[in-house]
């Protein structure tokens, strides 16, 4: 799955993101709007993880999407 597809179809994928990262609020998901850098930034804020770890978490999530 490439990120352009996620960005273009964010409404379809944000439910999956919410399931994976329950600490993301609905407002967070609206602000992210499918932008990877926004998602990673919000995840860093909500989970207190390092940037590299968040990037790996997002990569792992992408691998699970069909």
From Swiss-Prot:
It comes from the Bacteria. Transmembrane segments: none annotated. Pfam families: CsbD (PF05532). InterPro entries: CsbD, UPF0337_stress_rsp, YjbJ, YjbJ_sf. Belongs to the UPF0337 (CsbD) family. This is UPF0337 protein bsl1473. It comes from Bradyrhizobium diazoefficiens (strain JCM 10833 / BCRC 13528 / IAM 13628 / NBRC 14792 / USDA 110).
């Amino acid at each position: 799955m490439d990120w352009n597809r996620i960005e273009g179809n964010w409404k379809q994928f944000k439910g999956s993101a919410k399931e994976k990262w329950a600490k993301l609020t609905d407002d967070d998901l609206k602000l992210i709007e499918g932008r990877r850098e926004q998602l990673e930034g919000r995840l860093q804020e909500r989970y207190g993880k390092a940037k590299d770890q968040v990037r790996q978490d997002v990569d792992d999530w992408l691998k699970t999407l069909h």
